[in-house]
């Protein structure tokens, strides 16, 4: 007895992926299955078109995300590969991504979006447009698509695949056909240590780094610095694992410090070049003034660099200006894959990080060096209430920039010879080799012809070609290389959603015919409304010409005129304006009448929409003098609007400012206050008194020298009397002095009338080494006699000059 095979329906539990293979055979579904399909309301009700039971084959098939990450960065692009290990194969598949613990029966259950790489291999499912399936059922061993990670706050996501090998054999959803990715905490971006494996790739690869700044008043309005906002020049390199330019948790080098605080890449480049054995390419790109404007999207700063097996990492940084020491960049980004190949594309959203050298908390905080220096760390929304990124709820910081790293060529023998997609065959066509002209000197060529039209007539990738002729081969034993050159290109007619194409305005009406009678030419124009988002050049024509015939027949009254001259510049720099052109009468009419032919024409002209291109500005002036005469200051430069009335409001900065450093400021000598005047050095007659001051700060850096530290002035005591009574008094004092001297010799201390004194102390050190200083010594009372009537029993102090020789 033959049983009808029961149709199989994909589980609507945590399974996130289903695989469908359209087969020619008609399938019979049970009523129960159809009821379940109807209950799903038509949203991704996926019926697996296979007649059989699920097989165990998870060692044969695998679902991998390039780099094998456990976390995803919101908005980043990841290459997803579904493959079969030879000799296994598969004919059909389905790939889908859902939020964790979601069933997939609602639109909001799905996470991220897929991008098709090869339309001949893959397509979106007609009944479930968020899922990817095969374009045609045939034997294959691998397919690839890009998955764009969902926005912040999505949580964990599960990618799942189902595979149909034959009509009665299928594998679904579990084991190696499932990949779980969780959202990466932006505050830990790049902080977690990740092992850098030895690279096994062969040959070299060439990449282009493109930097898209997104830091603007619209995206980051709090305290946004309207003046002098900019990104400094990009500096970095491709290097080995033995060299670190910068890393989270490490300390900034002097080069990193100068980039972070001054925006100067000079020291950083010097440090990189000193590591010549560990560095393959120094990466440099221009600065952006201001930090965001449309031209930064159309022609974003970019730089090309190469990597090899030893030097397969790349790092770079650029300063947000003005800021204390804030930067963005990548550290040790590995471009080598575990499959011994080279990563095709890296897209990273960037948040700012602190270099740990300045403690400012706002864009324009005054200089405040961090002592001791702190480690490099990412900024967070809870750092400081005055921070422009502060959020009391602790949310993630909005990305300030995006960097795109694309592989543009591979050179030399490659280990992984399977192309990542069909476009690799075009993308890897010899652009690397064109950097060095290896044409033998014995081969003489003509110049290259112009590039041909793109081979694709629709908005798809194609090739264009140019040729040259071999004029002479001077040595027949030396072969001459190619006479044809190919380059990838995009065909015309792309839609507005295509980031690599232009958006054009409608054609302006045809101009008048160039002649007043007979056959002439006319033209019309259009303008670029939106340049390509990827910064490529717009190749679509902006002008068309065609022949025109004026019905009026040329008669004897007709005149001969020259060709029209070139059109004058449009009277407006943006929006609608007028332009003129002129011609001259070469020969007047034969009948002597006036020439009726036009000799001047005027027509409307359309420039790009106002504020979509940079303003028409004069060149920058020279930098002004530093705002200070010594130490740290600021300097500025200006530019002017060339056509203010026509342009209207212009948001471009007309002034720039940067830090400047001059020699240290002089420090003058600092002195203490004057001391009190000393006692007069004479008890009668003329004498002098002294006062002093001390040096508290010696002069530095050419400061004012120290003035005098000792001053003298005359003093007069009572007149010295010579009367007998005075003479007797002196004799009495002399007698008492002799008696005191005797007592002093008898005792261990000195004795004055009425008291006994201790010996004089030693003289103090001189207050100056030269130019006149003073010394002091003291005598103190040791014992007072009760019967003494003398009042001179008190502590004594003596002062004398010292080091009076000139300095």
From Swiss-Prot:
Pfam families in the cross-refs: Reeler, Spond_N, TSP1_spondin, TSP_1
TSP type-1 domain span: 442-495, 501-555, 558-611, 614-666, 668-721, 754-806
Record-listed Ca(2+) binding positions: 325, 354, 358
Gene3D superfamilies per UniProt: F-spondin domain, Reeler domain, Thrombospondin type-1 (TSP1) repeat
Segments of skewed composition (Basic and acidic residues): 732-746
GO molecular function, one term: metal ion binding
Region of interest (Disordered), residue spans: 732-752
InterPro entries: Reeler_dom, Reeler_sf, Spondin/Thrombospondin_T1, Spondin_N, Spondin_N_sf, TSP1_rpt, TSP1_rpt_sf, TSP1_spondin_dom
Assembly and interaction partners: Binds to the central extracellular domain of APP and inhibits beta-secretase cleavage of APP.
NCBIfam families assigned: NF038123_dom (NF038123)
Record-given protein name: Spondin-1
Biological source species: Rattus norvegicus
């Amino acid at each position: 007895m033959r049983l009808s095979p029961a149709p199989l329906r994909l589980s609507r539990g945590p399974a996130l992926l289903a695989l469908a293979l359209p087969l020619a055979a008609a399938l019979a579904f049970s009523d129960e299955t159809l009821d379940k399909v109807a209950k799903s309301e038509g949203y991704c009700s996926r019926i697996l078109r296979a007649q059989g039971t699920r097989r165990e084959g998870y060692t044969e098939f695998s679902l991998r995300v390039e780099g094998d990450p456990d976390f995803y960065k919101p908005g980043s692009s990841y290459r997803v590969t579904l493959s079969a290990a030879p000799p296994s194969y598969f004919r059909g598949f389905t790939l889908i991504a859902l939020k964790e613990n979601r069933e997939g029966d609602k639109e909001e259950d799905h996470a991220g979006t897929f991008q098709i790489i090869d339309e001949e291999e893959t397509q979106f499912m007609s009944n479930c447009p968020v899922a990817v399936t095969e374009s045609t059922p045939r034997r294959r061993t691998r397919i690839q698509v890009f998955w764009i990670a969902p926005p912040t706050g999505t949580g964990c996501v599960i990618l799942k695949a189902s595979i149909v090998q034959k009509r009665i054999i299928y594998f679904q959803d579990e084991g190696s056909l499932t990949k779980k990715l969780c959202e990466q905490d932006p505050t830990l971006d790049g902080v977690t240590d990740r092992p850098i494996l030895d690279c096994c790739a062969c040959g070299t690869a060439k990449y282009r780094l493109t930097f898209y700044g997104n830091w603007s008043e619209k995206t980051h309005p709090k305290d946004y610095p309207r003046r002098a906002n900019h990104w400094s020049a990009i500096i970095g390199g491709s290097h080995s694992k033995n060299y670190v330019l910068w890393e989270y948790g490490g300390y900034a080098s002097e080069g990193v410090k100068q980039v972070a605080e001054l925006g100067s890449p000079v020291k950083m480049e010097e440090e990189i070049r000193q590591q010549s054995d560990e560095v393959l390419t120094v990466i440099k790109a221009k600065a952006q003034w201001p930090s965001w404007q449309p031209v930064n999207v159309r022609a974003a700063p970019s730089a090309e660099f190469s990597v090899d097996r030893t030097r397969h990492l790349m790092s770079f940084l650029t300063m947000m200006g003005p800021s204390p020491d804030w930067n963005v960049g990548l550290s040790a980004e590995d471009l080598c894959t575990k499959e011994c190949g080279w990563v095709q594309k890296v897209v990273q959203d960037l948040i700012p990080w602190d270099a740990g050298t300045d403690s400012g908390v706002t864009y324009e905080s005054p200089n405040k060096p961090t002592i001791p220096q702190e480690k490099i760390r990412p900024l967070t929304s809870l750092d400081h209430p005055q921070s422009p990124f502060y959020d009391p709820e602790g949310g993630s910081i909005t990305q300030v920039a995006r960097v795109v790293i694309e592989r543009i060529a591979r050179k030399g023998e490659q280990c992984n010879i399977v192309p990542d997609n069909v476009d690799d065959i075009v993308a890897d066509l010899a652009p690397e080799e064109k950097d060095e002209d290896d044409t033998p000197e014995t081969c003489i060529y003509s110049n290259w012809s112009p590039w041909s039209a793109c081979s694709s007539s629709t908005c798809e990738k194609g090739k264009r070609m140019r040729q040259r002729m071999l004029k002479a081969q001077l040595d027949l034993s030396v072969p001459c290389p190619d006479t044809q050159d190919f380059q990838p290109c995009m065909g015309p007619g792309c839609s507005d959603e295509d980031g690599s194409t232009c958006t054009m305005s409608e054609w302006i009406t045809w101009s008048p015919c160039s002649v007043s009678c007979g056959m002439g030419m006319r033209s019309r124009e259009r303008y670029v409304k939106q340049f390509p988002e990827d910064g490529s050049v717009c190749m679509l024509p902006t002008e068309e010409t065609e022949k025109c015939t004026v019905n009026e027949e040329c008669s004897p009254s007709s005149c001969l005129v020259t060709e029209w001259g070139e059109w004058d510049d449009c009277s407006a720099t943006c929006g609608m304006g007028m332009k003129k052109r002129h011609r001259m009468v070469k020969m007047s009419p034969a009948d002597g009448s006036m020439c009726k032919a036009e000799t001047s024409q005027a027509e409307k002209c359309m420039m790009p929409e106002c504020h979509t291109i940079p303003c028409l500005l004069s060149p920058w002036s020279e930098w002004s003098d530093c705002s200070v005469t010594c130490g740290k200051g600021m300097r500025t430069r200006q530019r002017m609007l060339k056509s203010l009335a026509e342009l209207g409001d212009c948001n471009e900065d007309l002034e720039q400012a940067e830090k400047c450093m001059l020699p240290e400021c002089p420090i003058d000598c600092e002195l203490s206050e004057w001391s009190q005047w000393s006692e007069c050095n004479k008890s009668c007659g003329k004498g002098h008194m002294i006062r002093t001051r001390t040096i508290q700060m010696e002069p530095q850096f050419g400061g004012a020298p120290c003035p005098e530290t000792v001053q003298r002035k005359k003093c007069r005591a009572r007149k010295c009397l010579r009367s007998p009574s005075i003479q007797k008094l002196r004799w009495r004092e002399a007698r008492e002095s002799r008696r005191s001297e005797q007592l002093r010799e008898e005792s261990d201390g000195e004795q004055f009338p009425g008291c006994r004194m201790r010996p004089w102390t030693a003289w103090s050190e001189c207050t100056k080494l030269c130019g006149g200083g003073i010394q002091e010594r003291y005598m103190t009372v040791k014992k007072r006699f009760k019967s003494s009537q003398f009042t001179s029993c008190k502590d004594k102090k003596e002062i004398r000059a010292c080091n009076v020789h000139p300095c």
